[in-house]
């Protein structure tokens, strides 16, 4: 077995693997620079049988001074910062942003996010692998 970097000659094999899995997502654009790691595993016969594809995404953090202004003012400030942040992320080439809400604020703050166009995504079960302590 051999693990190596992806090359364009792997594309058809990866498309076939993707189709055979029958998952509900489009085949990704592997030329997108947000794919920062593309590893292929070949079997002993030299066939591409596995691929690990890592695309950068964005995890959002929001820090708020709860004593600064009244709720209406804080919401207005959040709207302004949200729009500026969205433009900034797009300018940097990002395609999506994710927010993991603490359970105690998820329902209420989730409604605020939805008012800005965010969608709750429970369709897939997220897992996390910490790479550093």
Residue ranges and their predicted role:
Residues 5, 16-28:
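Helix-loop element at the rim of GNAT/NAT acetyltransferase active sites that forms part
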Residues 122-133:
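C-terminal "cap" of GNAT-fold acetyltransferases
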Residues 1-14:
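A short beta-loop-alpha structural element at the N-terminal edge
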Residues 58-116, 121-122:
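Acyl-donor binding region in acyl/amide transferases
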Residues 3-5, 25, 117-123:
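Short secondary-structure junctions
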Residues 31-73, 131-133:
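Conserved donor-binding loop and adjoining core beta-sheet/short helix segment
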Residues 30, 101, 125-126:
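Proline- and acidic/polar-enriched loop/turn elements at helix boundaries
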